[in-house]
């Protein structure tokens, strides 16, 4: 069972439908017990970083997510959810994140040829083979964002070109992030979610 974390900041229903489509049992929940009992967790997110982080803290879900990480259960952050996995963001004001992946979120450079927000389809380049990235090289995925993850290169597993090289996917052990929306990215998005399913299966086996 995957729990999609509900904190009133995210596209939970579309992620749930995508998981249903690939036959992955899931539930949308903010209940801490249900989250801790899950085999894996997806942290969605749209909107502004400070408000999203504040809402996680208000509900105590920041602590729950860190407990999930300690339990070595897989986590996938999507869009803003990926940025929340980082150490901090400078969106509007400096805000500490969950600190589960090294790096911070900063605004995309404002250059005449590149519109902000970065919205639409962009091509992925695979930087490291993982269960989530094994089929992504050269594929197009759907982005909507104005901030990006500034991470050490060893945590970046796929990128897209824009005004900077955007980390499209990041990874730290059993914790993954996708800056784009897998649930809106057609067949390749489903393949990425299948890869997360593979990670869950592997982690579950190693913990038994």
UniProtKB/Swiss-Prot annotation:
Keywords, ordered alphabetically: Amino-acid biosynthesis, Cytoplasm, Glutamine amidotransferase, Histidine biosynthesis, Hydrolase, Lyase
Keyword Cytoplasm: yes
GO biological process: L-histidine biosynthetic process
Location in the cell: Cytoplasm
Location, primary (coarse class): cytoplasm
MF-aspect GO terms: glutaminase activity; imidazoleglycerol-phosphate synthase activity; lyase activity
Residues at the active site: 79 (nucleophile), 181, 183
Chemical reaction(s) catalysed: 5-[(5-phospho-1-deoxy-D-ribulos-1-ylimino)methylamino]-1-(5-phospho-beta-D-ribosyl)imidazole-4-carboxamide + L-glutamine = D-erythro-1-(imidazol-4-yl)glycerol 3-phosphate + 5-amino-1-(5-phospho-beta-D-ribosyl)imidazole-4-carboxamide + L-glutamate + H(+); L-glutamine + H2O = L-glutamate + NH4(+)
Subunit architecture: Heterodimer of HisH and HisF.
Protein name in the entry: Imidazole glycerol phosphate synthase subunit HisH
Lineage, top ranks: Bacteria, Bacillati, Bacillota, Bacilli, Bacillales
């Amino acid at each position: 069972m995957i729990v999609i974390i509900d904190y009133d900041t995210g596209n939970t229903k579309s992620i749930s439908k995508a998981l249903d489509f690939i036959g992955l049992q899931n539930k949308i929940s903010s209940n801490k017990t249900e989250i801790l009992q899950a085999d894996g967790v997806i942290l969605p997110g749209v909107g502004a970083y400070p408000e999203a982080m504040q809402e996680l803290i208000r509900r105590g879900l920041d602590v729950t997510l860190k407990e999930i990480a300690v339990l070595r259960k897989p986590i996938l952050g999507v869009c803003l959810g990926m940025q929340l996995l980082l150490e901090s963001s400078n969106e509007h004001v400096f805000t500490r994140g969950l600190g589960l992946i090294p790096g911070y979120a900063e605004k995309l450079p404002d250059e005449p040829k590149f519109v902000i927000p970065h919205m639409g389809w962009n091509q992925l380049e695979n930087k490291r083979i993982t269960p989530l990235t094994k089929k992504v090289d050269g594929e197009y995925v759907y982005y909507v964002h104005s901030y990006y993850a500034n991470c050490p290169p060893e945590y970046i597993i796929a990128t897209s070109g824009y005004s900077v090289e955007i980390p499209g996917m990041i990874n730290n052990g059993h914790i993954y992030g996708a800056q784009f929306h897998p649930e809106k990215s057609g067949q390749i998005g489903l393949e990425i979610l299948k890869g997360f399913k593979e990670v869950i299966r592997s982690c579950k086996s190693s913990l038994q």
